């Protein structure tokens, strides 16, 4: 127990020393970063300080005598010796040895343990006086008496003052003891002072009766079992106090050595762990105090039961010991509570500091990011609408940023509160509070500065807009004044009043001083805005100049009418300059003006109608017309920009109000099972469309606000990005089907309610489809007013491209509806055309019955023309709503385009054409709904076959060029082109696996062409394909009858008089050759040798020699059909000299 009390006295000494000067000089900085227990509890045991304990503290000596009642409880229960609590006259403790017949049989170890324990109970002061032993042997024999006395004297571990022996009471034994004691007196004196007593009264002469137990004739109340229970409880309590002290010591050391964590989570964990351990320590302290109070009550119980009960000294000592332990425990608890309060406060302040630091980092990052964004907002706008949009964005940005700013200001106030509460880290908190205040003020000032700049820009653009509006209204006024009415005095005066009245409004609407504008708006005038101001001012001056000219003219007219007008004959020049408008022309102007209704603005239609009237007597110049068209272009551009901005905002509204909410955990309970994880199906790639328009396309459109006629370039440069609409439209059927299944979902209703939308989500999902179709209408309007402008060609090309995208989107919607096709439709190349036709089939090797039935009963087929194949499908109508009602297409068959040929006209029917396969083994007669559709399909198929022909020619030429360098050319044996061709064909047939280009063969067998043919030598190609292509033949055949189709004759190309078209470019190779370009029309004059014809260019009238293979016949009226083929069993002549791929419409010679 010495450790426990050492800890207590250390605590008291620390308290007594806490006011020393050394303690007052302790560093405050060290106290800020570690737990200081110097003024609380020292839990480290110190043996030197243990000597400060009082001498009456029995518990301290348990380190010297480790025995306790619990260890020898069974030995003490034998009661062969006990400490009754009695005292001698000088205060010596009395140990009684009652009559115990088996005393001699007690083992020495047990006897030694009991003696050692009993002598350790009294205080050191009482034990120093010496013990009095009372040995009761009245019922024993002398021999036992002697043995007991000698054993006790030999083994007694403490000082002995007196040994009182009650000798045997029997006559014989008493007589024997007297005699024996007399003879052995010296032996007893040598060991201990022994007094042989004959009776109890004699014993009372040495020890007062009140200090003796009842069995010795005394009045001392002693119960051995009660004494043993009390001693066990007191020692157990002392041990509990010791363990509690050790636990406090370990816990205090742990707290003292704990470093303050650097983050919120770790600090919270440390605080929680320490609080939990502190609760456990407090529980153990309370348990010890409860145990001590219970023991004290037990010790006081005999006195409480009887007032006359006397308490011996041992009982008093026990009560004092327990009281002292309880007092020390209470003091220890109080000291620990004080120490814990400081430690807990330190940890709580540390946690507050970490929360503050974490919040500071987050807020500072947010404020820095917002400051960077506001610093990057340098755009002051290029139009009034743009500035208003920027101001709206700034307001939205400020509203979103207000959360971070409010959080920063609240955090700064929180830091000030910590400082006021005397936080230990004031030096760290105060600078951060100042920095937060500075960041908030800086951000607020930047927002204010930005708002002031935009307000200035808004003010300037309002002035510019007002000026432009004034100029536009002036131009409209000038354009709307009918010149014929101004010829009269009243009309001229009325027009003059309108002019003067309008000029009076200029003081309020026009820019007065340009220098003043420069000076007042210097802070926002960048190069673009400066140029815009100058343009507006120039336009204003130009308008004023036109008004002054009109005003001067009207004044002259009004002044001339004041004198009589002499009738004179009109001058011819005046008649030619100002013809009278005819009723037809007037109606024409009215009709043309009605075409401008796309913008749906009455004044614009009126201005356009007036401008389109005949120019009789009008004084407005071409510049005025251009200004009027420019105004119309500007209005189209404004409509394009306004609708584009609204479109972008609607997309953002859908993405934030619906798509993002599908990932919101708070809305998850509203989403039905059928809608979960299907956001991509419902919204498709709308987010991709939004980012394209918001980040790229809208900005590029805004850059064209001053030059609306150049907007076509924006569309052309971003035409590839517009392909994303095809993906969206392809997903639209799935999206609409999902919407119909889940349209009544509470999620959609809640989102619509939050957004305050009058229309449901499906209306907004249709916006991208509507928008892509809207562009072509706006481009048409812009093109109508920009026909003679710089960007007219770009507008036309952009319109064609947008229409192409719409067609591709429409075609792809049909394409995804094809069912039953085993292959990959993507491998067939780009989809070129699709449509429904009536189809008859005719097979060369089929049964006659099938042929005849096919003539009368057509099949309804939907054809899909790809670059590599044409697909025949059966259209099936579906029942349902929306996209579910769209038809599906069952795949029937397909034809490879490498083996397809066409016949343009069938039996004089303008709506029919043939597609035949494998040299007419299979023939399909196609009837289009209209001749125009037939022409479009024939042209598209012709383009595909021509491109295949060109690709084969290039490949053949490339192979010939490689082989001409590696193989020796044979010496020509004949000058006949036919024989040479036949010989070379045979050689090619002999070498199927390695075909040679015809150019090399023919050039080696034919005589050298004249000098004038050098420029056209590259046009003689072989069209023989690799073996796996199945003998790819010419893409064009000219036939006069069906018999000619199967004719096996071969020969060189014969001259047919008439006109021809040039298929490929040719440079001038000599003085007699003719340089031609593809598409030129020529007339054959003379047939030459070696494949050259002498022709005349019908355009330039120049003449010269050209290769016959580079010309295509323009036929006259004939019943023979024109066929275009890319495959089939072809003749040698066509293989040797392939015919051109492109056939134009027949033209008579």
UniProtKB/Swiss-Prot annotation:
Disulfide bond residue pairs: none
Topology in the lipid bilayer: Peripheral membrane protein
Molecular function terms from GO: 1-phosphatidylinositol binding; guanyl-nucleotide exchange factor activity; phosphatidylinositol binding
Basic and acidic residues bias locations: 607-616
Post-translational note: Mainly phosphorylated on serine.
Subcellular location: Cytoplasm; Cell membrane
Pfam families: CRAL_TRIO_2, RhoGEF, SOS1_NGEF_PH, Spectrin, Spectrin_5
Tissue-by-tissue expression: Highest expression in the brain, where it is found in neurons and alpha-tanycytes (at protein level). Detected in brain, and at lower levels in the heart.
Boundaries of every DH domain copy: 632-812
Residue intervals of the SH3 domain: 1055-1116
Compositionally skewed regions (Low complexity) per UniProt: 583-594, 964-978
Keywords: Cell membrane, Coiled coil, Cytoplasm, Guanine-nucleotide releasing factor, Lipid-binding, Membrane, Phosphoprotein, Proto-oncogene, SH3 domain
InterPro entries on file: CRAL-TRIO_dom, CRAL-TRIO_dom_sf, DBL_dom_sf, DBS_PH, DBS_SH3, DH_dom, GDS_CDC24_CS, PH-like_dom_sf
Residues annotated with Phosphoserine modification: 457, 462, 471, 480, 621, 1033-1034, 1041-1042
Placement of Spectrin repeats on the sequence: 355-454
Keyword Cell division assigned: no
Residue span(s) of domain PH: 830-946
A biological process from GO: intracellular signal transduction
Subunit structure: Interacts with GTP-bound RAC1. Interacts with CDC42. Interacts with RHOA. Interacts with CCPG1, which results in specific inhibition of its exchange activity toward RHOA, but does not affect its activity on CDC42.
UniProt similarity note: Belongs to the MCF2 family.
Name of protein: Guanine nucleotide exchange factor DBS
Gene (UniProt): Mcf2l
